[in-house]
Amino acid sequence: DMVKLYKIELLHVHYAIPHAYAGYMAKQMLKDEGIKIPMVTTLHGTDITLVGNHPFYKPAVTFSINKSDVVTSVSQSLKEDTLKLFDIKKEVVVIPNFIELDNHKIEADIPCYRSVLASENERIITHISNFRKVKRIPDVIKIFYKIQQSISAKLLMVGDGPEKERAENLCNELGIADKVIFLGNSNEIDRILSYSDLFLLPSETESFGLAAL
């Protein structure tokens, strides 16, 4: 209905599972009504290496990728993983993630906001992720534990996910709960990174590492 209402000319779906499969179904429904619309599928990482590689989902992922008109990957390594793990007949084009620099400018009021989180002599260490096991959240806490033994510092944990409670418990066990601030999900990543002194991303694996970008 959205395609017909807004006269959409292209379906660009992100993640092979479930969106590519849903996109294919929508494309077939439109085809039955005489509407032909191409579909581009962009692969991001966990849809291939984690969720998509599960035996239950693998046939559907393979099918939906092969039925896409164009397939893109956010990195060369993810492309290689895709071709290794699935029987893909389509060409996979690598188009890295990017940002628009004009939209990411440091604001003049940064010092004011920084002072709310840390004193002038404290360093700010920042981690941003979806708090899943692959992000090695306990290691982030342990790394900071060693850092704060040598220098005065605060740790900002930005994001949310299944490993958050474990991280909070570890902070309490190590006696650093007063030095770690859990900010949850935020729309002010630019501002947070602008007053950070160090960004930590010790992931087990990353298809691209969007948080680092």
Language model: regions and residue ranges:
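An aromatic- and histidine-rich active-site surface loop
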Residues: 10-35
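Nucleotide-sugar donor phosphate/pyrophosphate-binding loop at the beta->alpha transition
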Residues: 31-41, 46-63
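Conserved donor-binding/catalytic core segment of Leloir-type glycosyltransferases
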Residues: 72, 118-135, 141-144, 156
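Carbohydrate-associated surface elements
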Residues: 77, 98
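A short helix/loop element that forms part of the nucleotide-sugar donor recognition site in Leloir-type
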Residues: 104-119
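Aromatic "clamp/platform" in nucleotide-sugar-dependent glycosyltransferases that forms part
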Residues: 185, 204
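A short hydrophobic beta-strand element within the catalytic core of glycosyltransferases
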Residues: 199-200
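Short glycine/serine-rich donor-binding loops of glycosyltransferases
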Residues: 209-212
